[in-house]
Every structure is written in C-alpha cells, then in structure tokens.
A protein has these predicted regions:
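Short S/T/G/P-rich N-terminal loop/turn motif that feeds into the first structured element of a domain
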Residues: 1-64, 71-86
Length: 86
C-alpha cells in the first residue's frame, strides 16, 4: 500500500469550489481519494493506492494542486510514502 498527502492553504475561501472539483472523494479498487477541510482556507487530500506503480499513474490530483501553487492561488506541500509493515 502506498499513500500521498497533499496539504494546502488557499489564497481565498472562494477557491474551495476549485479544490472540490480537483479532489472530490473517490473510491475504486486500487485507489481511494478523500478531501478534508481543516479551516476556511486550509485542508488536505489523502490518496491511497494499491502500490507505487498505481500512484505513478494517478498524478492528476497532484498536478492540479501544484498548478494552483504555480499560479500563486495556494501554498501546497506533498508527501508520499509506503505503509510500514510489522
């Protein structure tokens, strides 16, 4: 199992409509995405993949959020990693 966490702070609360279009909740066999709101301008998107190969093919959400950052509409940070097995 592999995961990606996309944290963001929006320039304005009105940008939530854009984020909802980008990061709406999805549940598929090998992929799950959840959008969380932590404040008027902040939130995070969690993506869970079956493995790193699936993560490499599912980059649309990450690219769209990075696009908001490049346009100075949001501050975005991204972390990825594998589940630690006991």
């Amino acid at each position: 199992m592999y995961g990606r966490n996309i944290n963001f702070t929006l320039l304005a609360p009105s940008l939530w409509a854009v984020v909802k279009a980008i990061g709406s909740n999805v549940e598929e066999d090998k992929y799950k995405r959840m959008l969380f709101k932590t404040g008027d301008n902040n939130g995070f998107i969690i993506e869970v993949f079956e493995n790193i190969n699936v993560a490499g093919k599912k980059i649309e959400t990450m690219k769209a959020m990075q696009g908001l950052s490049e346009q100075a509409m949001a501050k975005v940070s991204i972390q990825e990693g594998s589940v630690i097995k006991n």
